[in-house]
Amino acid sequence: MFSFRTTALEDQLDKALLDGRVGCFCTQNCWDTARGRYMYDLFTERGNLKALFSPRDAELTPGTNHIMFDKEALEGLDAVVVEIQDAGARYFNYSKDVFHLMETLAGMENPPSLYIVDHINPAGRIVEGSMPSGDVEAHTPKVAHRHGLTLGELCDLWYNEIGATFALHVISALASDSTRQLLPWTIAPASDIPGMFTCEMYSGGGLWNNTTITPAIGTARPYEYLGAPFIRHNRLEVLPAPAGVLMRPCTFTPSTGRYEGQRCNGYQIMLQPGTEYHSLLHTLQLMRYFLERYSQFELLDGFESKIADPDMISYLKGEIPFLDLREHVKLEEQKWIRKAKRYSLYEDQPYRIK
């Protein structure tokens, strides 16, 4: 059973929420601006909060990027309320944790009802890339790299993909005062998604995590910067860059991650005002550029299952030209948009950069 609800969580009259045993699955993004409390405080005040699932460490702590749970902790609950901020790309760990939660509920004999308190997608309705083909990371739905959907819409899609039968209720992002009072990135969605531009960079930038070039994890501007100790700047060098994108040579020293404490040479990706940035295509161009110039640049374990697109791998290997890749991505984006529209819960629709 699926329902889409347009009134706020505290106004829901379901017995499971009013009198039942409730578990809350959330990050710092469940802050209620109107009432000055977190979502789970509602159930603490009602006296029926029985479980709280949240990241292990304080927010913005490097490496804090999963919500841990087990099936036993879900047994006996009447409702699980989820409120996280998705980041717009299918690799986002907290969203994959929600999909893992849904898989677990689908396998339970008496699962609790699942409530998703939806949020606006900080990466907007733009889509990039393709649906997975072949091996793919665990708990990953068949959506484009940058999907253009909200978490609630993704959960509706995943619910159908896994053939779930538990009750799923999505509470509209427009029902929340927080949506009207805050931009979706005001409270950082995760330790590596800290700012306004991060989500625009993440659909491509997230792929660097499975290479020997770091996307500046452990700095204040991850995914806007990239680099490695082996990169050498050359004043005459011309990096691939689409219209409206500038590449500034820079250095940085990450406080954590692959090159913790090491000076990295690299680049800052800067977007001119009004630019609609196709992070995925640009990242693939940069990767091919570095693969052709640095023997130290490698694609590591997990890269192929993360990108999950044979044509993109062929491009990186130099087997097809960029024009062929771009046409492939165009067709795949059109295919994804047709599918995505079936799960759209809001007036604005996913679209591609032309």
Segments (PLM) and residue ranges:
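Conserved functional hotspot residues or short segments at active or partner-binding sites
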Residues: 222, 227-330
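N-terminal phosphate-binding or glycine-rich loops at protein starts, especially the Walker A/P-loop
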Residues: 1-47
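Conserved anion/nucleotide-ligand pocket segment
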Residues: 135-205
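Glycine-rich, charge-decorated loop segments at or immediately adjacent to ligand/cofactor-binding or catalytic sites
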Residues: 60-61, 115-136
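Glycine-rich, highly charged phosphate/nucleotide-binding loops
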Residues: 4-11, 61-73
